[in-house]
Amino acid sequence: MSDGFAPKQENWLSRVARQVPGFRGYFEREDRRAADEAQRRALAERLHRSGAALGGLSQRWLAAGAIDALPLVDALRRRLDVLINRLGNAPRGYSAFFDRQQIDAARLEAVYQYDSELLWDVELLAKKIEEAVSSAAAADAPSLFNELTAAVAVVEERVAGRENVLRDL
């Protein structure tokens, strides 16, 4: 490419490709569906591993007698489960993105950008959940719930934005 975009794109894309299973498949039309599915499943699995730890938080708070905090954990778990299902079970290849021989570079960049941001946001959410599970006291339940719910909302918005970008291709 001689548009002056290639070096920046290559460095950025190389980083994403190393972190997301199957991401390199986006470059080839026939591999796009498989790459998209692999990416979504990897992100869903990351959230699932972190979300599973919320059960330990519930048990710890129950043992401490903080029964009032349990509905907050349950509500967070339900919302996280919906997000995990949305990521992991989305229809495979639901956009013209997966059928086109060539994609406009700007549109492809938008998809890559969403994927990179989604990867970052999922990792941030997973780490916040893991930190909360390892150290949160029941007295912190309301503020913790608000913080984690906000982090879930960021990922939900990122997933919706990515779906819109793919739909508009």
Task: Name every feature range the model reports, one short phrase each.
Residues 1-62:
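Leu/Val/Ala/Ile-rich N-terminal alpha-helices, chiefly Sec-type signal peptides and the beginnings
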Residues 52-144:
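Charged linear interaction tracts used for macromolecular binding and regulation
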Residues 4-7, 26, 39, 72-75, ...:
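Generic ordered-secondary-structure signal
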Residues 135-169:
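Preference for long, well-ordered alpha-helical segments
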